[in-house]
């Protein structure tokens, strides 16, 4: 049981870490390249052998795990982040039921993977633009849409919007993994203590 919860927490950390970048980009127009790369790589690693492998190792999720630790300890400063996380976890349910959108996203991710082979960098602006467009043309049609609040100056810039959408796609990918590991919204009520303990284990 511990192993399942441990893996589920990694997936949830992936969601939160990607969404933290969404919040940061929306407010400042800037992102953390390492976090963006971890998020985009997780989108491209469709057939990874384990949740840890999806993110290239637990260390790459340190930021997300720390955010979860703060949340479980009632010390999270950004009160919009939990709401955004809940919205993405709910979006995952609508996404997975729409087989045509799932197929389109899968095809788009495969094309992006080939593009990464050419650029050699998953965090390259061209890749972010491609994945951002993929999100806009597919997932953004699901209702209700994810609403991102931030600085209008940055939210009016095409490159910023593309990166935000790419990060939302990455968050959704982690949400799908979370659900595949039997994640459920009731976990936050029924297994919150176990999830907090798993978060602490991952941070050691």
Swiss-Prot record:
Transmembrane segments: none annotated. InterPro entries: HflD (IPR007451), HflD-like_sf (IPR035932). Its main location: cytoplasm. Coiled coil: none annotated. Pfam families: DUF489. One of its GO terms (cellular component) is plasma membrane. It is found in: Cytoplasm; Cell inner membrane. It comes from the Bacteria. Keywords: Cell inner membrane, Cell membrane, Cytoplasm, Membrane. It is a peripheral membrane protein. Belongs to the HflD family. NCBIfam families: PRK00218.1-2 (NF001246), PRK00218.1-6 (NF001250). This is High frequency lysogenization protein HflD homolog. The lineage of its organism: Bacteria, Pseudomonadati, Pseudomonadota, Gammaproteobacteria, Lysobacterales. The gene is hflD.
């Amino acid at each position: 049981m511990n192993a399942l919860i441990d893996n589920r927490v990694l997936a949830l950390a992936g969601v939160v870490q990607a969404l933290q970048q969404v919040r940061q980009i929306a407010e400042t127009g800037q992102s953390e390249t390492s976090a963006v790369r971890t998020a985009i790589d997780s989108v491209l690693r469709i057939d990874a052998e384990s949740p840890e492998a999806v993110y290239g190792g637990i260390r790459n999720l340190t930021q997300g795990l720390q955010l979860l630790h703060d949340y479980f300890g009632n010390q999270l400063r950004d009160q919009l982040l939990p709401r955004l996380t809940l919205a993405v976890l709910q979006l995952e349910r609508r996404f997975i039921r729409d087989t045509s959108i799932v197929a389109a996203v899968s095809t788009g991710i495969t094309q992006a993977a080939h593009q990464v082979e050419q650029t050699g960098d998953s965090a390259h602006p061209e890749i972010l633009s491609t994945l951002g467009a993929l999100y806009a043309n597919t997932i953004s049609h699901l209702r209700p849409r994810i609403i991102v609040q931030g600085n209008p100056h940055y939210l009016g810039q095409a490159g910023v919007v593309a990166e935000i959408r790419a990060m939302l796609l990455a968050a959704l990918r982690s949400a799908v993994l979370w659900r595949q590991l039997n994640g459920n919204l009731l976990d936050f009520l029924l297994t919150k203590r176990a999830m907090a303990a798993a978060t602490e284990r991952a941070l050691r």
